[in-house]
Structures are given as structure tokens and as C-alpha cells.
Amino acid sequence: MAETSKDELQLLEQAGAVLAANRGLIDRALTVLKANTLDGDRVSPTKLDDYQLVSYELSLCWAECTAASFLLCHARRLLDEAPDADGVTTSLACLFCAETIASSTARLRARPADFGLTEAEISAATDSAGASFMASQLAADNLAAIGARVLDRDGDLGADLLGEHHTMMRDTFRRFADDVVAPLAEEVHREDLIIPAEILEPLKEMGMFGLSIPETYGGLQEDDKEDTKGMIVVTEELSRGSLGAAGSLIT
């Protein structure tokens, strides 16, 4: 492994350690929430209703931490399968991880007793190495440097490991978003128009509305498995052209 890749791996491992410590706090808070809302061996909706804010904030913390964990895993996989010359994926993954930890910690710290935690426990979850990682990642200079690298790459974030099938889907709907959706987006939003036929008809012809329908029923999805990744790829490309005019259609 090249020296640069070793440095990236070390940074990803550090990010993973800080994230794991933060997730430990969330797990403890979830344990407390579960104990407070159980009725026998099942969660009571009535009791859970008394902990709406806690439930919401823990759900958000967990979702963000899970997303950060997957992004770190993706960056680690890229080091093995498609090393990125300037490490932009690693940088983005570590930055997102730090931002996730910062927002999660802020939620827990705002009302620690409601989560069954203390201020001391929250503070103890981040050691000196973790604090140093957070400070370096969240520094304005770091954000500016990452942004400059993304601009230099014209928005290309490197290999995505989608595979041939999903890459073809992405490229097809990316062209459609650029050539058809984007030129119409401003007028659709400004005039609060319904989605025009110029967008709907080609998408229908491309089979977009059958992406989640099994082939048995006339759709494009294989009968024996779902294609969630394909749905995400198409949604992201159409959303890039316009979230309101095309990105929400597939859902």
C-alpha cells in the first residue's frame, strides 16, 4: 500500500474510533428509552408517545451515525479497489463523520438527563485524540480546501464502484437531467407549474416508472430481487436536474 493510502487508512480508522465512541452514547440512550417505554416485552405506543422528542432525536442521531459509518466503509473500500489520487473521498468521509458527531453530541448535550446520560459521560466519550480529529476536520480551512479540490475535479468525486449496469443507468439519467430537466427547472419552479409533458413522456418511454415493478408484471425489475441501488441512482441524477420537477417522480 502506498504511503498516501496508509495515511488515509489511518485517518479513516481514527474517524471510525471517534464515531464508535459517539455511537456508544447513542446506544446507552436507546437502552434507557427502551426501558422507559416497555410494556412487558414490547414497546408501548402510549409510553413511547411520552418520549417523542427523545425518540426523534435519537432516531436522527442513529441515522446520521449509520450513514457516516457506511461512508467510511465506502472510502476504505476505495483504497483497496480504486485508489483515489488526491484522497477526496477519504476527506469527504472524515468531514461528514466529524459533522455527524458534532451534531449528535450537541443534541445529547442539550438535554442529557432526558437521554439518561450525564454531561461527564458525554464529555468522556471524546478523548484527546478524538478532540484533535474533530478540531482538524471541522476547521474552516479544511472545509475550504476540500471544496477547492471538488471544484478542481469539476464535481467528480472519484470512483463509485457502481458496476456496469448501474453506471449505465446513472449516465442515461444524468444526460436526461442535463438535457431535458435542467433547462425547464427554473420555469417550473418560478411559475409553480405541474410537471410538464416534456419531462414525463420521455421518462415514461425510458421505463422509469417501471423500475420498481417486477418483470412478471411488465416492469423492469428482476423478479427475484429488488434494485434499491438503481432507484437511488436514478433519483439522485434526476434530483440533480431538479428535485421538484423530476427528482421526486420515482418515489
Protein language model regions, located:
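Internal helix-loop-helix
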Residues: 79-82, 162, 205-251
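Non-transmembrane, amphipathic alpha-helical segments
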Residues: 7-21, 46, 50-60, 82-85, ...
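N-terminal capping segment at the start of a domain
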Residues: 177-187
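His/Cys-centered metal/cofactor-coordination and adjacent catalytic loops
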Residues: 195-196
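A glycine-rich, basic-preceded beta-loop-alpha segment at the flavin cofactor/substrate interface
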Residues: 1-15, 26-52, 228
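C-terminal helix-coil-helix/basic helical segment that borders enzyme active sites and/or dimer interfaces
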Residues: 34-45, 49, 55, 66-118, ...
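Intrinsic disorder at enzyme termini
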Residues: 1-22, 101-173
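Core structural elements
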Residues: 53-65, 202-207
